UniProtKB/Swiss-Prot annotation:
InterPro entries: AH/BAR_dom_sf, F_BAR, FCH_dom, Fes/Fps/Fer_SH2, Kinase-like_dom_sf, Non-receptor_tyrosine_kinases, Prot_kinase_dom, Protein_kinase_ATP_BS. ATP binds at residues 354-362, 377. The F-BAR domain is truncated and contains only the FCH region (the coiled-coil region is missing). Residues 1-20, 152-208 are annotated as: Disordered. Belongs to the protein kinase superfamily. Tyr protein kinase family. Fes/fps subfamily. This is Tyrosine-protein kinase transforming protein Fes. The modification Phosphotyrosine is found at residue 500.
């Protein structure tokens, strides 16, 4: 922006959130352009190399000039053509190598620098905003304190002035009443007493408030005791950046769109997976339809007129009821807001890697807003869309649950890649490692309390018709106060009738923890979770030993089918082992419910010293 004196500088508008949003949009657009340039150059290098190879191959096919002699004009022409073809091949190959080692390489470095610059800019802006807010609040509190002190002093001075004014008025009235005459004669005692009482009456009469005093008093009652700040200048919704729009769902997997769109004309905007494109998804005639929002010359359009931003485009389509395309005739009706659980990537500060899952790394972190400690599960960007949808299945399950023995969901980051699931950070680590490192020092009552926690969490899931399918010590977490929480809901499913029929092979199935009917027929239920809970009990009281240690998965299946079961751990109470055996009943209907298991464990714990 240009200053009034003609020099160039930054406009004050860039200091506002709107300016920050515009700056971020510009950075995103530049990065998308650079990525497009890099892809174009890489394709050019590839094409030039392939073309050079084909030309070289053609130049080697010199069969046409054989037998004509070296002095034949045709032979000489053919030799010249093949020579020039070989020269062109070398030139193209050299050009491709120069492009690859020069501009393409430097462009890659530039992209990384711009990405780092964008990250640094965002972090610095957040830090400045926090410092500004903190300083602003401190200044306001200081001014408030000064104002209150001045208000008290003013009120006290006003009261003193009013009292002095009343005394002055009374004295003046008394003097006027006495007049300029001689002093009165000496009175008798009775007259003096009467005079005194008359004087008191006069003084009492002097205290009667006048109409003006009453008005002043009443106005003081209704006068506001504080000043209000001036109203803020609100930013119209259409001028807010894309990531602040309620209908922008970020990198939402395509598979989840159908669940959010329920009525004809419902729509949302999302980022295309694997491509730097935005997609407008609309429900029409009972089917979700997906339109790529074209971007050219910094204008956005599905077809026809272009707009400077996607919010302006969406606002126009909603207001005008203009069809998205002439061919489709689809009209936008209702924007579907993003989930309340959605967080921005900028809301997180990532820490060190603390683990690795099936979908990607797990990091520690904090929420910028209040420094809450969190665990951040990431999903690798290279995974196919259907796998990314499975990654979000865990968050979809946990959104509905709240229990002290179920790990708590904080939110999901789907606004851009990579996708994150944000959960409470349980700092004690997983239960299996805890048993192997701390188990020997734990009292029996503590172990009973911890498996009781697991039973309480599973009883809650059972009441919600949720089947965990992967219950094991490795998938439970321990707090610093030895409270156990059920975690890892990646394989969990909800079933209205309490039974889930799985399809596919056993590649991902934990065979040694899984009930026979689930392995044989793919039939999962709370009863199959009870079988897994029996294995969890065995892991607990064997202090983290591996079940069926000398058997393969196939041998374990055959052993269980023949009636074989795990032996009683050395330090396990008899009552707990009897409960394990009940959990391992071959028929699902003969296994106890989690409610009964919880009650039995509570009873055993009370009896145990």
């Amino acid at each position: 922006a240009a200053r009034a004196d003609g020099t160039m500088g930054f406009s004050s508008e860039l200091c506002s959130p709107q300016g920050h949003g515009a700056e971020q949009q510009m950075q995103e657009a530049e990065l998308r352009l650079l990525e497009g340039m890099r892809k174009w150059m890489a394709q050019r290098v590839k094409s030039d190399r392939e073309y050079a190879g084909l030309l070289h191959h053609m130049s080697l096919q010199d069969g046409g000039g054989r037998g004509t002699g070296p002095y034949s004009p045709i032979s000489q022409s053919w030799a010249e053509i093949t020579s020039q073809t070989e020269g062109l091949s070398r030139l193209l190959r050299q050009h491709a190598e120069d492009l690859n080692s020069g501009p393409l390489s430097k462009l890659g470095l530039l992209i990384r620098e711009r990405q780092q610059l964008r990250k640094t800019y965002s972090e610095q802006w957040q830090q400045l905003q926090q410092e500004l807010t903190k300083t602003h609040n401190q200044d306001i509190e200081k001014l408030k304190s000064q104002y209150r002190a001045l208000a008290r002093d003013s009120a006290q001075a006003r009261r003193k002035y009013q009292e002095a004014s009343k005394d002055k008025d009374r004295d003046k009235a008394k003097l006027e009443q006495l007049g300029p005459g001689e002093p009165p004669p000496v009175l008798l005692l009775q007259d003096d007493r009467h005079s005194t009482s008359s004087s008191e009456q006069e003084r009492e009469g002097g205290r009667t408030p006048t109409l003006e005093i009453l008005k002043s008093h009443i106005s003081g009652i209704f006068r506001p005791k504080f000043s209000l700040p001036p109203p803020l200048q609100l930013v119209p919704e259409v001028q807010k950046p894309l990531h602040e729009q309620l209908w922008y769902h970020g990198a939402l997997p395509r598979a989840e769109v159908a669940e959010l769109l329920t009525h004809s004309g419902d729509f949302l905007v999302r980022e295309s997976q694997g491509k730097q494109e935005y997609v407008l998804s609309v429900l029409w005639d009972g089917q979700p339809r997906h339109f790529i929002i074209q971007s050219a010359d910094n204008l956005y359009r599905p077809e026809g007129d272009g707009f400077a931003s996607i919010p302006l485009l969406v606002d126009h389509l909603l207001r005008s009821q203009q069809p998205l395309t002439k061919k489709s005739g689809i009209v936008l009706n209702r924007a579907v807001p993003k989930d309340k659980w959605v967080l921005n990537h900028e809301d997180l500060v990532l820490g060190e890697q603390i683990g690795r899952g099936n979908f990607g790394e797990v990091f520690s972190g904090r929420l910028r807003a209040d420094n809450t400690l969190v665990a951040v599960k990431s999903c690798r960007e290279t995974l196919p869309p259907d796998i990314k949808a499975k990654f979000l299945q865990e968050a979809k399950i946990l959104k509905q649950y709240s229990h002290p023995n179920i790990v708590r969901l904080i939110g999901v980051c789907t606004q851009k890649q990579p996708i994150y699931i944000v959960m409470e950070l349980v700092q004690g680590g997983d239960f299996l490692t805890f048993l192997r490192t701390e188990g020997a020092r734990l009292r029996m009552k503590t172990l009973l309390q911890m498996v009781g926690d697991a039973a309480a969490g599973m009883e809650y899931l059972e009441s919600k018709c949720c089947i965990h399918r992967d219950l094991a010590a490795r998938n439970c977490l321990v707090t610093e106060k030895n409270v156990l929480k059920i975690s890892d809901f990646g394989m969990s499913r909800e079933a209205a009738d309490g039974i889930y029929a799985a399809s596919g092979g056993l590649r991902q199935v934990p065979v040694k923890w899984t009930a026979p009917e689930a392995l044989n027929y793919g039939r999962y239920s709370s009863e199959s979770d009870v079988w897994s809970f029996g294995i969890l009990l065995w892991e607990t009281f064997s202090l983290g030993a591996s079940p069926y240690p000398n058997l393969s998965n196939q041998q374990t299946r055959e052993f269980v089918e023949k009636g074989g079961r795990l032996p009683c751990p050395e330090l396990c109470p008899d009552a707990v082992f009897r409960l394990m055996e009940q959990c391992w009943a071959y028929e699902p209907g003969q296994r106890p419910s989690f409610s009964a298991i919880y009650q039995e464990l509570q009873s055993i714990r009370k009896r145990h010293r």
